[in-house]
Amino acid sequence: MTKNIKRKKTRMALLVVLLALILAVLAVVCVYETELNKLDSNDGVDNSFYDSQFSQFKDKKIMVIVPHEDDDLMAMGQMLPQLYKNGTDVRIVFATNGDKRVSAYTRQTEACNALEKLGIPREKVIFLGYPDGTNMYVKKAGEKSYSYSTGLDHTYSGKGFREYHFQKFGTHAEYTVENMIYDIENVILDYRPDYIIAIDFDPHTDHRGVSMSFETAMSRILKSENDYQPKILKTFCYSSEWKAKPDFYSLNIKSVHKPIKEKLSDPTYETNVPQYNWDDRVRIPVYKGSVSHSILRCPEYKALGEHLSQFAFVYSDRIINGDMVYWTRRTDNLLNDASVSVSSGRAELINDFKFVGVKKIKSPHAKLSGCVSKFDKNDAEKTVTVKFKHPKTISCISLYDDFDLDSNITSGILSFSDGSSINVNALNGDGSETKVVFAPKSGITSFTFKVTGYEKSAGLCEIEAFEKADYDPGFSLIKLKNADTDDYIYNYFIGPNEKSLNLGAYVSDQNAEFSIKLTDGEGVKLEGNKLVFDDGFKKCTVRAELNNDHSTYDQITIERLSEKGLRSYESFEKVNRILFKIDSLRLKTKNIFVNGYFYETLHKFVKNALKKVGINIK
């Protein structure tokens, strides 16, 4: 009897302890969630880019073209879901099956699951079905390419999926670069998107190959479909995301910053495409609901977590940023309706919509080739002749010099069919755009560009001619930023001793004028574009608008943290880092069992353990 009473008391005590532990855990969770909600509060934060009432993208069509199943999230994962929710029709095109080490079924299932996490249904996804990690893009005609995992030499898809070529033509396409170009061309023309987001020339085999294939396909489309001129934005997934600095954990969200030189294919330039200047990038703000002070709350992290086989979630602290960065490729080039000839060199390279190319596609630091038309040194003329099929009105010509820093065109002359001419000074030696703007010339049937001076050798990558010098990107945008750090601002926190904040603004139309004003808040004043805080400041709201279009706006909040609040945040950040590591471990463990990597993981563990004691297994 006494023993039973003791057992009951012991059980009761254990239950009480367990209940106390549960209550303690719940209390900690409640405190954590409360603090997180305070930090993440975006009341008062808004941007017209995502305004559902005045959506610029409602009933518009966007197509994303990327190599692998997960690149879509890096290309526009923080932007696309809200645009889709606001009425934009989207298509995500995956060029390869991502099947070098993992099955196509696994990659395709992960991609669909990830997009569904963001609210984008499976029917919006298109798989082209080409192989992953091959040098198919630079092989000569007749040379075969095969899938590493299946040995197939033609497009295919995982169980339950159908690749694009088979759906459209009823047959599989042989693995050739020409077939990929053909499929990209067809999928674009089938859908005719208003906007195309495409991968750019990352130091990765498939990223380079798909970028070059897309540009070739686009060149063919623009030359055959003169009435179709989509807005094109190209983006990098490696230098600005996958291999960027892991800077998620900070008091305020960081924007994408200039790539680390050592991470680039050629550190001579600012990006992996020499023609791109960092300051010319297009900076799209992310939707306010896509960021949180806890990475586990970010929708993109949840989507990346579906890509178990790629461990994409591990890089979330690099991928999730305060903006998304692109470069515009204009499609209104008048040379698309013209013939081009040269006194020497390769005329086809001058208007092929392609800035860069490479032969050794697998080498991260391979020398760029096949993209510059070089004049023979003995050529006394060194002239490009452009003849239009129909008379044109021209107000701007863009010249792209050979990006070899030692080979520069130092002077030239543009001559037009109306008898006029323009002297051209030295072109930008890094190959970036040299824009020659002039009063509109009407009825132009042809023009020439003659090199009159050069260093080492003379060559041109591209020539473009436009009716209008300024380009309409297809949307209107303004976004406030920290003028000192260049980071975009959303719900922004300042420390207890900060007395001012210099504001700047990114505007999609660089010629547009804008105004910044305080809409509420005490203890703060606006001096020009500088916010000045006094000791009593707590919180304010700031709004920026275009002067000629008040429907294009941005609104942010600024809040001061006390000493206690700042210490609390620092502790909070440490907890978040730990939670991120724990959840990453959870997802890695899940991958071992879901994708059958148990023995592969065990093998790596044993191999690394033996390596530490000096035993190397090849």
What are these regions (language model features)?
Residues 10-20, 24-227:
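Active-site beta-strand->loop->alpha-helix modules in alpha/beta enzyme cores, enriched
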